[in-house]
UniProtKB/Swiss-Prot annotation:
Catalytic activity, reaction form: Random hydrolysis of (1->4)-linkages between N-acetyl-beta-D-glucosamine and D-glucuronate residues in hyaluronate
Keywords recorded for this protein, A-Z: Disulfide bond, EGF-like domain, Glycoprotein, Glycosidase, Hydrolase, Secreted, Signal
Tissue-by-tissue expression: Expressed by the venom gland.
Cellular location(s): Secreted
EC class name: hydrolase
Listed name of the protein: Hyaluronidase
PROSITE patterns hit by this protein: EGF_1, EGF_2
GO biological process, one term: hyaluronan catabolic process
Function as written in the Swiss-Prot or TrEMBL entry: Snake venom endo-hyaluronidase that degrades hyaluronan to smaller oligosaccharide fragments. In venom, it is not toxic by itself, but increases the diffusion of other venom proteins by degrading the extracellular matrix. In addition, it displays antiedematogenic activity.
GO function terms (MF aspect): hyalurononglucosaminidase activity
Species of the source: Echis pyramidum leakeyi (Leakey's carpet viper)
Record: glycosylation sites: N67, N103, N111, N153, N357, N401
Length: 449
């Protein structure tokens, strides 16, 4: 009778803590015992090599490529002209490779892509982020609105030229069918090729999934941040893409109009919430790792994020259970010695310290509650709980001398800190582990890997 009661109590605790929702296992982190990673994906090589300005990325727990380059062993991003023969129209109106996917050879594209991957990522054991940045068109016909409507018009004309005998209604239906078929083949086969060639990488498309919650400019105080239901439904229809991805790369870029506002948090939160939803539906064995793209400065400016907006971006991403965040930047960051010094000052100030705060807090929570076999995620995704070091218990200290700079975190969790974490966070176990605290090793789950 006693054992039955214990089992009942354990089940009740499980349901209460997890709100009755099954939490999928997560893929183990890219680096052991690093539940939340911060990447640097900005072309700042010139700061180090030309201007002799070290941005101190490593000091502040940031993963970067050699010489802080845009692409390398940690993260490689493929723009339209870097991978295969991607059909599109650029921002200047120049046409490339047949413009629409059904007007270009997929075989030619894949052959060129193979050569490009070997050239750009020569290391076959590549274990970093492989990000394909194709934003000119979307694979779903109904999502090619605004400036992207040109791809629908071109597809209709393409179908009309091939089948002049058909009615306009049939031509439009055929154009949609042929476009979506070709777009799917281009995106899916490119992804599968990359994964076959560099199987240890984390592959996916930048800005997928999207949420289309950009109406903060018009809604003002009425803005909710929620993804429109039609867009969530359209994301569901991209299951073929999620199943073939090994990582998701949504973005949480903040425009300056959102600076230190409630709308900023709403915007970021719901984009991440949608990404985490997609991550959990993509596979049956584990949730895909989510790496959110962010900017350390407000979009289209060189103004650094406020402390509040660092919490909104970095803090929210970690608390929601993402595997990491990727800081993207432009050539402006390294355009002059003054630009480099500005980035360095921000890195040595609020940005670097907050990154250390969150990455350390995530690591401590994983160690204390999940036995290093899982990461801490919010029990209630809409809560305002964050993975922060408790200021009354921890101190972040930066030491520097003529040869090196290092960050040391001193302190320990107090009882009230443990209570806060237990009340607000739960464990998402890595593959092969289960239990409330990821304390049970499961050979069955390992065999699924």
């Amino acid at each position: 009778m006693y054992h039955i009661w214990i089992k009942f109590l354990a089940a009740w605790i499980f349901l209460k803590r997890f709100n009755g929702v099954h939490v999928m296992q997560a893929k183990a982190p890219m680096y052991r015992n690093e539940p939340f990673l911060v990447f640097w994906n900005a072309p700042t090589t010139q700061c180090r090599l030309r201007y002799k300005v070290d941005l101190d990325l490593k000091t502040f727990h940031i993963v970067s490529n050699a010489n802080d380059s845009l692409s390398g062993s940690a993260v490689t991003i493929f723009y339209p002209n870097h991978l295969g023969v991607y059909p599109h129209i650029d921002d200047r109106g120049h046409f490339f490779h047949g413009i629409i996917p059904q007007n270009e050879s997929l075989t030619k594209h894949l052959n060129k892509s193979k050569s490009d991957i070997n050239r750009i990522i020569p290391l076959k054991a590549f274990h970093g982020l492989g990000v394909i940045d194709w934003e000119n068109w979307r694979p779903q016909w109904d999502r090619n609105w605004g400036s992207k409507n040109v791809y629908r018009n071109r597809s209709i004309q393409f179908a009309r030229d091939l089948h002049p005998e058909l009615s306009e209604d049939k031509i439009r239906r055929l154009a949609k069918k042929e476009y979506e078929k070709a777009a799917k083949s281009f995106m899916r086969d490119t992804l599968l090729l990359a994964e076959e060639m560099r199987p240890d990488g984390y592959w996916g498309y930048y800005l997928y999934p999207d949420c289309q919650n950009y109406d903060y400019k018009t809604k003002g105080d009425q803005y909710t941040g929620k993804c429109p239901e039609i867009e969530m439904s359209r994301n569901d229809q991209l299951l073929w893409l999620w199943r073939d991805s090994t990582a998701l790369f949504p973005n949480v870029y903040l425009e300056i109009i959102l600076r230190s506002s409630d709308n900023a948090l709403k915007f970021v939160h719901h984009r991440l919430k949608e990404a985490m939803r997609i991550a959990s539906m993509a596979r049956e064995d584990y949730a895909l790792p989510v790496f959110a793209y962010a900017r350390p400065f407000y979009a289209y400016t060189f103004e650094p994020l406020t402390q509040e907006d660092l919490v909104t971006t970095v803090g929210e991403t970690a608390a929601m259970g993402a595997a990491g965040i990727v800081f993207w930047g432009s050539m402006q960051y390294a355009s002059t010695v003054d630009s480099c010094q500005k980035v360095k000052k921000y890195m040595n100030g609020p940005l670097g310290r907050y990154i250390v705060n969150v990455t350390t807090a995530a690591k401590i929570c994983s160690r204390v509650f999940c036995r290093k076999n899982g990461r801490c995620v919010r029990k209630h995704s809409d809560s305002n709980a964050f993975l922060h070091l408790f200021p009354e218990s921890f101190r972040i200290m930066v030491y520097a001398n003529a040869t090196e700079k290092k960050v040391i975190v001193k302190g320990k969790l107090e009882l009230e800190n443990l209570i806060y974490l237990r009340e607000n966070f739960m464990c998402q176990c890595y593959q092969g582990w289960k239990g409330l605290y990821c304390e049970e090793y499961s050979i069955k789950d390992i065999r699924k890997i």
